[in-house]
């Protein structure tokens, strides 16, 4: 690997911009919203029971777009019930954006928000020091298990926080997506980092089976439009390359042979489909629900 290549995570500003471009060029959030609209009401149908208050815990809530969509479903399912929504998010920038989104969003009455600037591991350590451990009715972990050191321990811990009839929702890339094939083939030749694990739903399901935890898994097709990646000098394409490879300035720092090989692969049927003149990378998602 060329010494000039460095992990995208080493430049937080560029990482968040690349992530924003990914969201703008993929059906990721559209796919999540479809799941929330069609499946979530059934999943949360029993979490409230006759309670006067429902406690929701968001691990890795980011800027809050999906959190608020989830809360709208909880609120619709349990009209008039008070909702406590606590958010664990390590990025101060994301928390600021989340608070700004809440401030300009209507219909959030009866919802009390609290934010904690910490990682899930830091949250776990803090909770374990408390004499009385808070139980939760609904915990969701959206695209964040990649950033956990010990995933089985994390799953076991959050499962232990579930109240009666409570659920956990985990969202991450499907083992059937193009990501698994891409990571298997290229991760050893791309910059290594200590922040991210290359896991898919296949890994999480295996861990849950080993832990004896009951779950259900749903897969939904999502795509990422990478057409701009093959237009010379296209800034959007350059940032999408960075996101795909998790490499800062991939096009200008990658060895020519590696760059050519990846560019060829990402135009082939193993990773993409062509539709209406667009090149679409398979970004399929898995939605895993865990019972108390």
Swiss-Prot record:
Query: From which organism does this entry originate?
Result: Cavia porcellus
Subcellular location, record wording: Cytoplasm
Q: Which family does it belong to?
A: Belongs to the class I-like SAM-binding methyltransferase superfamily. HNMT family.
InterPro entries xref list: HHMT-like, SAM-dependent_MTases_sf
**What does the entry list as the binding residues for substrate?**
28, 283
Residues annotated as signal peptide: none
Q: Which residues of this UniProt protein bind S-adenosyl-L-methionine? A: 60, 89, 94, 120, 142
PROSITE patterns assigned to the protein according to its UniProt record, in alphabetical order: SAM_HNMT
SUPFAM superfamilies documented for this protein: S-adenosyl-L-methionine-dependent methyltransferases
Q: Has keyword S-adenosyl-L-methionine?
A: yes
UniProt-listed Gene3D superfamilies: Vaccinia Virus protein VP39 (3.40.50.150)
Question: What subunit structure does UniProt give?
Answer: Monomer.
Query: Reaction catalysed by this chain?
Result: histamine + S-adenosyl-L-methionine = N(tau)-methylhistamine + S-adenosyl-L-homocysteine + H(+)
Q: EC annotation? A: 2.1.1.8
What is any one of the record's Gene Ontology cellular component terms?
centrosome
An example Gene Ontology biological process:
methylation
Q: Is the keyword Methyltransferase in the record?
A: yes
**Major localisation:** cytoplasm
What's the protein name?
Histamine N-methyltransferase
What function does the entry list? Inactivates histamine by N-methylation. Plays an important role in degrading histamine and in regulating the airway response to histamine.
